[in-house]
UniProtKB/Swiss-Prot annotation:
Purpose of the protein: Catalyzes the formation of acetyl phosphate from acetate and ATP. Can also catalyze the reverse reaction.
Name under which the protein is recorded: Acetate kinase
GO molecular function: acetate kinase activity; ATP binding; magnesium ion binding
Phylogenetic lineage: Bacteria, Pseudomonadati, Pseudomonadota, Gammaproteobacteria, Alteromonadales
Source organism: Shewanella baltica (strain OS155 / ATCC BAA-1091)
A Pfam family the protein falls into: Acetate_kinase
ATP-binding recorded as keyword: yes
Reaction catalysed by this enzyme: acetate + ATP = acetyl phosphate + ADP
Lineage: superkingdom: Bacteria
Length: 399
């Protein structure tokens, strides 16, 4: 364990993920989750030295109390480890066009995150609560913001401008921003290492597949196109999100079927995707079980999920010009050999040949190439967003 430890915080609206990460190795010394904020059964769970712990936070507690518990209880019982924490790194979902890289947090940065809240109304306000709680609990430690959208700021305007009146972009910032940037950045770097190529000469298509999912075309280490848009709703079929649809469906739902706009937003974000198609579950594991049992809804959901993903991967060869590898990551990407095989079989025109044994072996945290030695390469790389946040935090405070 080095002296370059970073406490990484990822604040959601009703939960807080945390980890103490060694910026040199990426190893987590402590990892945990505080959840059910605002409810009677608010709890915190954590793991240290392989041992799992759990405690009640108290009824109706939230981010501030969770951070205080981390400081006054968990870290207080590990004084040697706590003494090596050099910074607090915060994952921030949306930085708009204002933030193109990670930054040390000051009042102007907090104001900038507030200004971007309309682009991520569920996430950015929660991040701000976490930042303020961390500043109160760690007044002497530098705080660093790492933005999911920053990696995609290298996209050319032909990739991020929507075919709407241009003044909507100019005056209101309505454009493609993309998400999962920290994950795509990490995985593309690891892919270059596996390919034994400089990142500047590596072209990959990265599929981050979880309950939220996105694909990014990465050319020479830079994002040149990505599937999520102004918000995380655009692009792939996801657990409960619809991804790409005809925008006129919204008009039809409101004016023909009597939905309110709030109901439409809830339908597209929380009732659609794998859940909506299958009428069974949003969990990919449940979808695969249903598929194996012959469940029609699960089978259709799986086919649409894979087909949409394959189409996106195929289209992203256009901005790359040359494809070195397709990379799967995220909970589904790292663990579903079935989905990987289905998608790559749909991309046979690109000369992918799945090695069944390699594909089945690349699960549960194991990385590796999953195609045969002939043809185009596909690989699995477990993501580690926390490591990127820790690395960026140490680099910034040492400048």
């Amino acid at each position: 364990m080095s002296n370059n430890l970073v406490l990484v915080l990822n604040c959601g609206s009703s939960s807080l993920k945390f980890a103490v990460i060694d910026a040199q190795t990426g190893d987590d010394q402590i990892s945990g989750l505080a959840e059910c904020f605002g409810l009677e059964d608010s709890r915190i769970k954590w793991k240290i030295n392989g041992e799992k712990h759990e405690a009640a936070l108290g009824a109706f507690t939230a981010h501030r109390e969770a951070v205080e518990y981390i400081v006054n209880k968990i870290l207080a019982e590990q004084p040697e480890l706590a003494a090596k924490i050099q910074a607090v790194g915060h994952r921030i979902v949306h930085g708009g066009e204002k933030f193109t890289r990670s930054v040390i947090i000051d009042e102007s940065v907090i104001k900038g995150i507030e200004d971007c809240a309309s682009l991520a109304p569920l996430h950015n306000p929660a991040h701000l609560i976490g930042i303020r709680a961390a500043i109160a609990s760690f007044p002497k430690l530098p705080q660093v913001a790492v933005f999911d959208t920053a990696f995609h700021q290298s996209m050319p305007d032909r990739a991020y401008v929507y075919a709407l009146p241009y003044k909507l972009y100019r005056e209101h910032g309505i454009r493609r921003y993309g998400m999962h940037g920290t994950s795509h950045l990490f995985v593309s770097r690891e892919a270059a290492k596996m390919l034994n190529k400089p990142i500047e000469e590596t072209n990959v298509i990265c599929a981050h597949l979880g309950n939220g999912a996105s694909v990014t075309a990465i050319k020479g280490g830079k994002s040149v196109d990505t599937s999520m848009g102004l918000t995380p709703l655009e692009g792939l079929v996801m657990g409960t999100r619809c991804g790409d649809i005809d925008p006129s469906i919204i008009y039809h739902l409101v004016h023909q079927l009597g939905y309110t706009l709030e109901e439409v937003n809830n339908l597209m974000n929380k009732q659609s995707g794998l859940l909506g198609i299958s009428e069974l579950t949003n969990d990919c594991r449940g979808i695969e079980e249903g598929y194996a049992d012959g469940h029609k809804g699960a089978t259709l959901a799986l086919e649409i999920f894979c087909y949409r993903l394959a189409k996106y991967i195929a289209s992203y060869t256009v901005p790359l010009g040359r494809l070195d590898a397709v990379v799967f990551t995220g909970g589904i990407g790292e663990n579903s050999d079935l989905i990987r095989e289905k998608v790559l079989n749909m991309l046979e025109i690109f000369n992918f040949h799945v090695d069944s044994e390699r594909n089945k072996a690349a699960r549960f945290g194991k990385k590796g190439i999953i195609t045969q030695d002939k043809g185009t390469i596909a690989m699995v790389i477990p993501t580690n967003e926390e490591w990127v946040i820790a690395e960026d935090s140490i680099k910034l405070i040492n400048k």
